[in-house]
A protein has these predicted regions:
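Short low-complexity stretches enriched in small and charged residues
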Residues: 1-4, 80-83, 102-109
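Flexible, non-catalytic linker and terminal segments flanking ANL/adenylate-forming cores
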Residues: 1-24
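Conserved AMP-binding/adenylate-forming core of the ANL superfamily
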Residues: 21-23, 32, 40-85, 89-93, ...
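Residue-level signature of the cytosolic catalytic core of signaling kinases
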Residues: 23-27, 128
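Short N-terminal helix-initiation segments at or just after the protein's N-terminus
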Residues: 27, 92-99
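Structural core segment of the AMP-binding/adenylate-forming
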Residues: 69-70, 97-170
Length: 170
């Protein structure tokens, strides 16, 4: 019988060597490379929405430009408080391309966790979901945010699902 360690170790040919050469680069280069080598390959899928690597890079670059127009500077900390949506991926890569730091934030956090998390990280800007506003709105002064970007689930959907989502919320 093969042990757990033997099973995965059989895939490795040797030990890592201390002379391993690392090539440090900015994380946003990874998206650029993926979009350059496989622009039409599907990068993400959500309900009836599909996005290629080229489209993801384009959305990320546009969002990065919007962040910069709204005062986000390299090194700023931007909280991304979203569930698993295409906007989460676009926001992350947009923050990277703007040179800022993404502070991934659990959308289930409430007042105590948000206040501690944002203060500890030095968050200046927030990207969140409209249905979370009821928890964020009352904390705006406490959190000392300079900007808040709000999106909706239906922003990630194509017809007819975006229409149905809007009707359901109404």
């Amino acid at each position: 019988m093969t042990t757990h360690n033997e099973a995965w170790q059989s895939h490795f040919t040797g030990r890592p060597t201390p002379d391993l050469t690392l090539h440090p680069r900015h994380l946003s280069v990874v998206l650029d490379e993926a979009a350059g080598t496989a622009p039409r390959r599907e990068a993400l899928r959500f309900q009836n929405t599909r996005m290629t690597y080229a489209e993801l890079r384009e959305h990320a670059e546009r969002f990065a430009a919007a962040l910069r127009r709204n005062g986000v500077q390299p090194g700023d900390r931007v909280a991304i408080m979203l569930p698993n949506l295409p906007q989460t991926v676009v926001a992350f890569w947009g923050v990277m391309k703007a040179g800022a730091t993404a502070v991934m934030t659990n959308p289930l956090y409430r007042e105590t966790e948000l206040t501690r998390h944002f203060r500890d990280a030095g968050v200046r800007v927030l990207i969140t979901l409209d249905i979370l506003w009821q928890h964020i709105g009352p904390l705006l002064e406490t959190l000392a945010l300079e900007r808040v970007f709000v999106t909706s689930v239906d922003d990630a959907l194509r017809p007819p699902l975006n229409w149905l989502y809007a009707l359901k919320r109404w």
